[in-house]
Amino acid sequence: MTSTLSPLAVDDHGVDHDFDRAAGERPPVEVFGIRHHGPGSARSLVAALVDYQPDAVLIEGPADADPLLRWVLADGMTPPLALLGYATDRPQTAAFWPYAVFSPEWQAMKYALQRDVEVAFCDLPAAAVLARWPRGATHDDDDEPVQTADEPAETLRPISLEQHDPLAVLAQAAGYDDPERWWDDLVESRLDSSSPFPMITEAMGELRMIMGQDGRDAERETRREAYMRQQIRAALKRGRERVAVVCGAWHAPMLRWPLPPA
């Protein structure tokens, strides 16, 4: 597997998009912080995309997998399925990006392709991720590119703030002992027709200010989010006026408009 990363030299102020939300205008970038494989997230996401009417959809996923997106609507391409990335000279170094029919990312792909809307993955290329793993290393949960702290259901549990589990912290603040139950009540079993995404982004933003980041995960997440912002700026430079960004909820505050510095 080979890939070339070309940093985009985009001035933070190079794209001027003024809007008045109070007047009903929509921002040039809307971020939809989802939970991977969440049926409620998928349902709310499709409704939000229909409302926003984006002219570009950027999805958290390996940017070098963009050529595969054209197969999403192919006959027989039915989830569950997964993207597989591996180093050609050491195939044991591999990573998977799985999708179910109720995965928000899968629904976002279908939404865009069925409407001839530009769609692309916006996360670090798989080649860049795999290249950082030591030779001979094999995939494990700590290195899973698609699992961040807000997402993998099997690792969510009530823990302390210092252990950096955002869903558990928010659940505890809301009076829940079980973060799974809290998220289910908030999003997955949500009956309210209003979008949950602004609330999710605000909550994650406050939580990130309190919790901060440190260690290896912080370096990795900072690098990923900087790359995703580059892809958003590139879409705006191409003249896109409504860019929908579908990403794990933890990343949403760092990708919302106006964009933070690169």
Map each language-model feature to its residues.
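Compositional signal for N-terminal targeting/processing segments
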Residues: 1-262
